[in-house]
Structure formats: structure tokens, C-alpha cells
Amino acid sequence: MDIDVLNMFLVAGGTLLVPLLAFMTSFLLWPAALIRIYYWYWRRALGMQVKYSSYGNYKFCYTARGKPGNKPSVLMLHGFSAHKDMWLGMVKFLPKNLHLVCVDMPGHEGTSRSALDYYSICGQVKRIHQFVESIGLNKKPFHLVGTSMGGNVAGVYAAQHPTHISSLTLICPAGLMYPIESKFLKQLKVLEKSGDNQRIPLIPSTAGEMEDMLRLCSFVRFKIPQQVLQGLIDERIPHNEFYRKLFLALVDEKSRHSLHENMNKIMAPTQIIWGKQDQVLDVSGAEVLAGSLRGCQVEILENCGHSVVMERPRKSAKLMTDFLSSLQSTDNHKKHD
């Protein structure tokens, strides 16, 4: 009897041990695969469905939750070398009754990458306009959100297509003339003088460089296991040549100050969110936008770096939700007057 009981525990223990060993082996040997599983799980948990749309031969990949309703739909544009899933932390805290759309920017993740594509800000705005038309998002004005590179694209889109945009949230956007030069922009100047475009801090190729990039982008010091860092690098390395091409297009004269050159054409109510300790794009950019956009709402987050959406997802979601609610309240008052 005792032997039977012992065997039962051994069988039970073995049953539990097999998946545990499989997990440990996967973690050690295929960390990139586990990162993909992680995003798949959170998309599923949050009700974000992966979808595709086409404009001619060009394919867009995006995630969506909900359907268009009385409130404006929300389109979210990620930053350089990121992807649609970077918004998941913020999506978790957004109201379930909002129609959300997070698209992979041109050349990123599941969206087409073409050698013939023009990756300047104007080129990306054109592609995002095609995406908007392909899913019929512009049937009525929508709220547009963008961070970093995506903020640059969002701002220029709002300037060029004012009738499409009900309101705008720019999170530490690129494309401005910043009164104070950031740590990253200083590093960039040194690289430009030397003619070295292989050591761009935002394009890491080792786990150590990945750690340096995270320290540059984030005020919060996340404790990330070495295997996860390696997984992140394994995911990025096949795309680094594209990221380099894209980066050079973004810092070219035609794109570097695109938002600055177009900000006076933005008509939509605008919200600006910036991390006070941003080392990539200095927070002084918020003053530049506030000086040009009449009545815009500025939110500066203490103890927060460039990766606002990753560092402060709950706060970012609340600020955007409150902003949208205040606009709806203003519209309701106008209707009753």
C-alpha cells in the first residue's frame, strides 16, 4: 500500500515535472519563442484580435477590440522598432467600450516591408492614411495616439487630414526642435560627425547593448533576466538592417523636424504626455507644442523616462480616458446650449 502511494506521488510529480522541464528548456534555449507566447497570451486575455487589411498589394497587420460606436474610435501608433503589442499594458486600463485599433507601423512586425517603400515621416503618413481607408476608420472622426516616432507621424497626419481627427494624444513625440538637447541627441551628433551609423544606441545587437538601450529609454530600472534580454535581441537582430535604414530616413532633413514644421496646422484638441526624465527626446519639447497648439493639455509625468507607455501604463490610460471624457462633456454642453 505504501509503495502504491509512493508510486502515485511519483507519477503525479512526474506529470508536473514534464511541463516544468519543458518550460525551463524553452526559457534557456528559445527565449524569443516565450516572448511571442507572452504577447499572444496578453492579447487573448485583453480581447485584442489580430487582423489584416490590404491596400493594393500592401498588407497591414493590426489588433483591434470592440466596434465603432457613439464614442470616437482610437488608433494607436507605436514608436521606432516597436510593434502593436507595446500598447497592451495601457490597453489593460482602457475602458472596454472603446473601439481600439493598434497597427504595426510600415515595415514593422506583420505589416509589409518593401525595399521600394519610402520610410520618411511623410511616407509613413501616406501609409497610415491607406490603412485608415482600408478598414474604413475615417467614416467618422477618430482619436489618434502616437508615441515617439509614432507621435511624429500622428501629429503630421492630424495636420494633413484634419477632418479625420476628433482629437489627438502625443506621447513624447519625435520631430521637434527641442530647446534642450537630450542625452540621445548628443550621442547622435557625435555619431554623425564620425560618420558611424553602425553603433546607433536604439539599434542594439547584443544583450549588453539591449540593457544600455533600456537604461536610456526608461527611468524605471526594470530587472530583466539575461535570458529575456537575449530573447529580445534574438527577435530584433534579423530586422536591424531595416531599423538602420528607417532610422537614417527619420533623421534625414526631410523628416527630422516634420512635426515642428506641421504643428501650426493641427486643428484637433490635443493632449501632450511626456516623461520628465526623458533622455531620448527632452521634455522641453512639450513647451514647444504648447506654444503652438492653443488650449492643448500638457501632462508631465515625474520619475518617468521616454518609454511612458511601458513605465506608466495605468497613468497614461487614465490621462487619455479623462481627456476623451472632458471632450465629450464639452460637446454635450454645446449641444444643450
UniProtKB/Swiss-Prot annotation:
| Protein localization | Late endosome membrane; Lysosome membrane; Mitochondrion membrane
Parts of the chain on the Extracellular side: 1-19
Q: Which SUPFAM superfamilies match?
A: alpha/beta-Hydrolases
Q: Name one GO biological process term.
A: lysobisphosphatidic acid metabolic process
> Looking at the UniProt record for this protein, which Gene Ontology cellular component terms does it annotate, in alphabetical order?
AMPA glutamate receptor complex; late endosome membrane; lysosomal membrane; membrane; mitochondrial membrane
List the InterPro entries: AB_hydrolase_1, AB_hydrolase_fold, AB_hydrolase_sf
Give the positions the UniProt entry annotates as the active site: 148 (nucleophile), 278 (charge relay system), 306 (charge relay system)
What superkingdom heads the lineage? Eukaryota
EC number(s) per entry: 3.1.1.23
Q: Tell me what reaction this enzyme catalyses.
A: Hydrolyzes glycerol monoesters of long-chain fatty acids; 1-octanoylglycerol + H2O = octanoate + glycerol + H(+); 1-decanoylglycerol + H2O = decanoate + glycerol + H(+); 1-dodecanoylglycerol + H2O = dodecanoate + glycerol + H(+)
The UniProt transmembrane annotation reads: 20-42
Annotated GO MF terms: monoacylglycerol lipase activity
Ranges facing Cytoplasmic side? 43-337
Its placement in the membrane is given as: Single-pass type II membrane protein
Q: What is its main location?
A: membrane
| DNA repair keyword on record | no
In its keyword annotation, does this UniProt entry include Mitochondrion?
yes
Using the record's annotation, list all stretches that form the AB hydrolase-1 domain.
Answer: 72-313
- One Pfam family matching this protein: Abhydrolase_1
The UniProt entry's sequence similarity note says:
Belongs to the AB hydrolase superfamily.
- Please describe what this protein does: Lipase that preferentially hydrolysis medium-chain saturated monoacylglycerols including 2-arachidonoylglycerol. Through 2-arachidonoylglycerol degradation may regulate endocannabinoid signaling pathways. Also has a lysophosphatidyl lipase activity with a preference for lysophosphatidylglycerol among other lysophospholipids. Also able to degrade bis(monoacylglycero)phosphate (BMP) and constitutes the major enzyme for BMP catabolism.
- The identity of this protein, by name, is Monoacylglycerol lipase abhd6-B
Organism (species)? Xenopus laevis (African clawed frog)
